[in-house]
């Protein structure tokens, strides 16, 4: 996975440079849609077929997205370059890195909140507000439910993890008692 990230980084940075001259949100939508299409096994199968030309693969990818930017010459060039260089499998990683660049520019970050129980609106808003104060940036939350946590939450922002779950506390106590 690290190799994909390394290979995808220049593509994401170049694309972000193009997006800065226009509408970053629109480019973000386009890249996310292209990444979703590129994840489909059928698309990868067609792309690797010798019976289908590279131009046809590019047209297929662009036809599968709804973004109005799909008709943009730079978007067409990106897709054609990825197809020509057999790099379609990079699109999901390019999308991830593009979002990271976008978040860094906005002073924001994606946060994964794993909770033992569903978080309701006000409860989630309070948690996100306190996390924004702690991490000193705007957070975009994604919530997952994991009953094995027993209680509490595990928060992941980038490479930082804050685990206040009951399961983590029990594991900590077990380590302390057996040491």
From Swiss-Prot:
GO CC field: plasma membrane; proton-transporting ATP synthase complex
Pfam families attached to this UniProt entry: OSCP
Classification via InterPro entries: ATP_synth_OSCP/delta_N_sf, ATPase_OSCP/dsu
Membrane-protein topology: Peripheral membrane protein
Subcellular location: Cell inner membrane
Keyword set, alphabetical order: ATP synthesis, Cell inner membrane, Cell membrane, CF(1), Hydrogen ion transport, Ion transport, Membrane, Transport
GO MF annotation, one: proton-transporting ATP synthase activity, rotational mechanism
Known partners and oligomeric status: F-type ATPases have 2 components, F(1) - the catalytic core - and F(0) - the membrane proton channel. F(1) has five subunits: alpha(3), beta(3), gamma(1), delta(1), epsilon(1). F(0) has three main subunits: a(1), b(2) and c(10-14). The alpha and beta chains form an alternating ring which encloses part of the gamma chain. F(1) is attached to F(0) by a central stalk formed by the gamma and epsilon chains, while a peripheral stalk is formed by the delta and b chains.
HAMAP family (alphabetical): ATP_synth_delta_bact (MF_01416)
Family per record: Belongs to the ATPase delta chain family.
Role description: F(1)F(0) ATP synthase produces ATP from ADP in the presence of a proton or sodium gradient. F-type ATPases consist of two structural domains, F(1) containing the extramembraneous catalytic core and F(0) containing the membrane proton channel, linked together by a central stalk and a peripheral stalk. During catalysis, ATP synthesis in the catalytic domain of F(1) is coupled via a rotary mechanism of the central stalk subunits to proton translocation. This protein is part of the stalk that links CF(0) to CF(1). It either transmits conformational changes from CF(0) to CF(1) or is implicated in proton conduction.
Name of this chain's protein: ATP synthase subunit delta
Name of the gene this protein is made from: atpH
């Amino acid at each position: 996975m690290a190799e994909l990230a390394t290979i995808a980084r220049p593509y994401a940075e170049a694309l972000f440079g193009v997006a800065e001259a226009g509408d970053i949100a629109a480019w973000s939508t386009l890249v996310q849609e292209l990444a979703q299409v590129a994840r489909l096994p059928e698309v990868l199968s067609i792309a690797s077929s010798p019976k289908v030309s590279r131009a046809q693969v590019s047209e297929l990818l662009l036809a599968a997205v709804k973004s109005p930017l799909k008709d943009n010459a730079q978007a067409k060039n990106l897709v054609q370059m990825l197809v020509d260089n057999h790099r379609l499998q990079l699109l999901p990683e390019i999308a991830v890195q593009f979002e990271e660049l976008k978040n860094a520019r906005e002073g924001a970050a994606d946060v994964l909140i794993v909770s033992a129980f569903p978080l309701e609106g006000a409860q989630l808003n309070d948690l996100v507000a306190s996390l924004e104060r702690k991490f000193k940036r705007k957070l975009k939350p994604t919530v997952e439910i994991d009953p094995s946590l027993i209680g509490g939450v595990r928060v992941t922002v980038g490479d930082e993890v804050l685990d206040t779950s009951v399961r983590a506390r029990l594991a900590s106590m077990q380590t302390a008692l057996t040491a």
